[in-house]
Swiss-Prot record:
Keywords: Electron transport, Membrane, Mitochondrion, Mitochondrion inner membrane, NAD, Respiratory chain, Translocase, Transmembrane, Transmembrane helix, Transport, Ubiquinone
The protein, known as: NADH-ubiquinone oxidoreductase chain 4L
UniProt record, GO biological process: ATP synthesis coupled electron transport
Mitochondrion in keyword set: yes
Domain of life according to the entry: Eukaryota
Record's catalysed reaction(s): a ubiquinone + NADH + 5 H(+)(in) = a ubiquinol + NAD(+) + 4 H(+)(out)
Top-tier EC class: translocase
Keyword Mitochondrion: yes
One GO MF term: NADH dehydrogenase (ubiquinone) activity
Assembly description: Core subunit of respiratory chain NADH dehydrogenase (Complex I) which is composed of 45 different subunits.
Species whose genome carries this gene: Metachirus nudicaudatus (Brown four-eyed opossum)
């Protein structure tokens, strides 16, 4: 179980460094955020099954629902930015302010 937790934490850290490194493009940032959410989902499911905490067994599913909503909003923002400006640079987000 320790090796599984270590691999999941390493996947989360790898996705976090991807967010920090590839923050100039919105698509790369969204993909790294999805990797972070999936590693959190796997970690929560593994901890719940390991410690037999079945009273909170819906929490990973709720996390997946919020992750899907976040991905939908992010992709809608990506389509809007790419249609307006022709690229997915994050610097264009400052231009959307009123």
């Amino acid at each position: 179980m320790v090796l599984i937790k270590l691999n999941i934490i390493m996947a989360f850290m790898l996705a976090l460094t991807g967010v920090l490194i590839y923050r100039s493009h919105l698509m790369s940032t969204l993909l790294c955020l999805e990797g972070m959410m999936l590693s959190l989902f796997i970690f929560m499911a593994a901890v719940i099954t390991h410690f037999h905490m079945f009273s909170i067994s819906m929490m990973p599913l709720i996390l997946l629902v919020f992750s899907a909503c976040e991905a939908g909003v992010g992709l809608a923002l990506l389509v809007t930015i790419s249609n307006t400006y022709g690229n997915d640079q994050v610097q264009n987000l400052n231009l959307l302010q009123w």
